[in-house]
Amino acid sequence: EDPQVYYPEAILTVNLGASNALALVHVGGGATNEIYEVFAFIGCDAIYTTVDSNGTLEPAGFIVGASTQYAFGLACTPEGFVQRESWFVGSGDDWENEPWDITDDEYEYDPNRGHFALLSSKTIQLTWSEIQDQDISLCHFDCPGAGAGC
């Protein structure tokens, strides 16, 4: 069976296929800083981290922001290891911590770089308290033993 993440407070759960899943879980916070837990399952590897809506990050890997907008993603190295990555969302269209153009409906996907990322500019421009009302698109890539597609 495809691994699924079921959690009563999950505001975002994405099934990425045979052995990949992602969930964003709201776990608390106050009026100015909401706290989320991120669970990612890639093959047999489980990745967990905590993020908040002010962009604070622990441990390194995922970044989200409410006023300054970030996207988060995972990448597969040529050796088959899962690598966490993040990108700032601004203007331009380059990869890896370079600003992106959020006026496009979808960000370009570079299969030669082996990335998947959030592809909804409307979602990224919203605060995370509103994200549960939006459609999320994820693009993922060839990993040893896993399929590829968007």
Map each language-model feature to its residues.
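Beta-propeller fold detector
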Residues: E1, I47-T56, A117-L126
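Short N-terminal edge-element motif at the start of the domain
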Residues: E1-S19
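Acidic/hydrophobic-patterned starts of short beta strands in beta-sheet-rich repeat architectures
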Residues: T13-V27, G73-E85
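Residue-level detector of short, conserved catalytic/binding motifs and their immediate flanks
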Residues: A21, Y36-E37, D105
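Hydrophobic side chains in beta-strands
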Residues: V25, A40-F41, Y109
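His-enriched metal-coordination microenvironments in redox/metal-binding proteins
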Residues: V27-I35
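Short helix-loop boundary/capping segments
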Residues: I35-Q69
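Acidic, small-residue rich beta-repeat scaffolds with periodic aromatic anchors
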Residues: P59-C150
